[in-house]
Amino acid sequence: MELLKKYPKFFQWLFLLIVFFSLCFAIEVPETYNFIRGQAEFIKDPNQSTYTLFGAEVRYYAFDVFWRLPPLLGWLPIWINDSLFFLMNEWMPMEFWNEDIQEFRTQPLLLQITRNLTSFMTFLIELIREILLGGVETIVSFSSWDWIDANPWAELPGLPWTIVTAGAVILGYKLSGKGLALFAGLVMIYISVFGQWKPSMQTLSFILVAAPLSFLFGLTFGVMAFKSKRVEKFLYPILLVMQTMPQYAVLVPAIVLFGIGDHAAVIITMVVAVPPMILLTLLGLRGIPSEVIEAGRMSGCNNWQLMTKVLIPTARRDILIGVNQVIMVCFSMAVISAFIGAKGLGFNLLLALNQLNIGLALEAGLCISLIAILLDKMSLAWANKQIDYFGNLTYFQRNKNILFFAAAVILGIIFSYLGSFYFKDGSNYLFEVPHNKGISTADFWNKGVDWIWDTFFHTLKIFNTWLIVDVLQPMRALYLRMPAVATLVLVIGAGYIIGGIRSALVVGGLTLFIALSPWWDRALVTLYMATFGVFISTIIGFTVGIISFQNKHTANFMLGVCDIFQTFPSFVYLIPVMMLFGVTDTSVLIAVIVYATIPATRYTIEGLRSVPEALHDAATMSGVNKVQRLLKIEFPLAFPHMMLGLNQTIVFALFMVIIGAFIGTEDLGQYILKALSDKKGAGIGLTLGLCVAFIGLIFDHLIRTWVGKRKKHLGIG
C-alpha cells in the first residue's frame, strides 16, 4: 500500500496496460477476417451478408463490434460531396452579367464567387510571372488578342536574370551584409547557369502572390482574435486542426471549388499558410507588456492608432517570424500543388519522380531547396534587423540601395540588348539561359545511382528484406491486431491519467471519430509507420541533442543544420531514399526518420540551454560532475521542453508518412492520393484528412497537458 501511495501514477499506467492487453487477448479476430501473412494484413471476407446504414455498406456480425466498430460515419464523405454540389450548383441562384455572351445569366452565388476569385488570382500570377519572364496575358486582360497582334511592341519583355540577381544581392546586403549578399548571388547564378531559370521564376511568382496575401489575412485574423475572445475561441479549434491536417487532403476540395491550375494552388496555399501567421500574430500581440499599452493610451491614441502605431510595431519580430513561416509553408506547397497543375520547379520534380529520373529530380529539388533557404535567411534577417533611422544622412546615403538597383536595371537591359547581337544561336544568355542550353548534372547523378545499385545491391537488398520481413511486417500485424474497443480504452485511460475527465473525453472523442470511419485499419497502418519513425527519430534526436549541447560551437552548428534541413520541402527527402531502396516502405520510413529527427534535436538543445545558469553554478559548487549534472539537474528541467519536441516529431512524422503515399504506402495517405483523381473525392479526402489530423491532435493534447502540469510542478515557465 505504501508503494501504491508513493507511486500512484505508475500503478495507474500498469493497470491500464494490463486491461489493454487483456482485451487484446480476449477479443479474438472474427471469422469474417482472413490474415494474409505475406502482406501482414487482415482482409474482410467478401462472402458475408451486408446491410446499409446512413448510405454506407456495413459487413458486420454482432460479435464483430468489439473488433472493429461499424463504420457509422460512412455517410460523412457522401454528405460533404452532396453539400459541395448543392453549394456550387443550386445555392442562391442570381443574375450575373456574362461577358462572353453579352447578357445576364443565372448562376449560383458560390460558383460566381469562385470564378471571380479564380480570375483575380490568375491575373496576379500572370502579372508577376510576366514581369519576371515576359508575356502578353496581362495586357490581353485589359485589351484583346487582336490589339496585341496589331501592336506586338506591347508584349512585356521580362527581366533579364542579371537584373533579378542584382536585386537579390542588394536586398541580401541590405538585410544582413556581405555574407547573405554573396549567398543570394551564388543561388541566382546557379539557377540560371543550370537552365532552371524559367521554372524557378514560375515558382517564385507563385510565392510572391500567395505569401503577401497569406500575411494580410493572417495579420487581420490575428488582430481580430487579439481584440475579441469570441473570435479567438472560434478560430482556435480550426487552427489546431489545420496545423495537423495533411496538405494533400486540402487539395481535393480545392479542385471542386476552383478547378486545377496555378490559381487553385495559390488559394489552397493561402488556406494552409494563414494559420501559422494568425498564431504568431496573436503570440506577438499577447507578449506586449501592459505598460506599453498604457503608455499608448496616455499619449491619446485611439484604437486604430494604438494598434498600428504601438502594438503591431512592438510585436514586429514575432509578426515577421510569422512571415518566415508563411514563406516556408508556401514553398512546401509549391511542390504539393503540382498535383493540381501548378507550374514551376514542383511540377518538374513531380514529373522526374514519376519517371524515376533521380538526376532531374535532384536538380529540381536542389533549386527548390536553395531558393527556400535564401528566402528563409532573408526573412529571418528582416525579422532580426533593427529599424533604420535617417537623421542627418544625405539623399544618396538614404537611398543608395534603390539607386544601385536602378543602375543594375539599366546596365542589365543594356547588356541584354548587346547580348542579342553577340549570341548568334538564337539564345541570349544574358537574358535567360534555356533549359536545354544550361549545365546539367542529371547524367552524373543517374550514373551515381547505377553505381550504388551495382556496388551495394546485395547489401541494400539484405537490409531492406530484413527490415520489411523481420521488423515492419510483424509490427504492422501487431497494430492491425489491436481491437477497436481495446484501443479506445487505452486512449481514454491515458487521457484520464494525464489530464482528468476532460482530457479523457477529448481524446476519446477524437479516437471514436476515427474508429467509426470506414478507414480504421488504414489509420492503424498510418500509426504503425509514424510510431516506428518517431521511435527512431526520438532516440537519434535526443542523443545528438544531448551530445551537441556539451559544446557551444557544436550546438550552434547542429541548430544551423536543423535550420537548413527544416527549410527543405518535404518531398525532397524522398529523392535520396528512392535512390537506395526504391519504392518500398523502407524508403518512406527512412525519409520519415530524417525529417522527424529535426525537431527532436532542436528542442533537446534548446531545452537544455533553457536551464538557468544559476543552477549550473550551484551544481558546480556542490561538486557534481558533468554526468551527474546532466542526469540530476539539466535533463529533468529540460524534459518538458524535450517532450514538446516529441510532439513536433510526431506531427512531422505524420506529414511525411502521408507524403510517402506518393511512392506506394498503404495507409491513409494512399487513399487521399486516390481521392485527388476521383471527381467525387472531396468528401473522402476531407474525412481522411480529419482522421490524420485527429491522430496528431490526440498526441498533441496528451503531451501538452502533461508538459503544462510538469512545468507547474517544477515551477518553471
UniProtKB/Swiss-Prot annotation:
GO molecular function: amine transmembrane transporter activity; carnitine transmembrane transporter activity
GO cellular component: ATP-binding cassette (ABC) transporter complex
Location of the ABC transmembrane type-1 domain: 200-379, 523-703
InterPro entries named among the record's database cross-references: MetI-like, MetI-like_sf
PANTHER family: GLYCINE BETAINE/PROLINE BETAINE TRANSPORT SYSTEM PERMEASE PROTEIN PROW (PTHR47737), GLYCINE BETAINE_PROLINE BETAINE TRANSPORT SYSTEM PERMEASE PROTEIN PROW (PTHR47737:SF1)
Family statement: Belongs to the binding-protein-dependent transport system permease family.
Protein name: Trimethylamine N-oxide transport system permease protein TmoV
Lineage of producing organism: Bacteria, Pseudomonadati, Pseudomonadota, Alphaproteobacteria, Candidatus Pelagibacterales
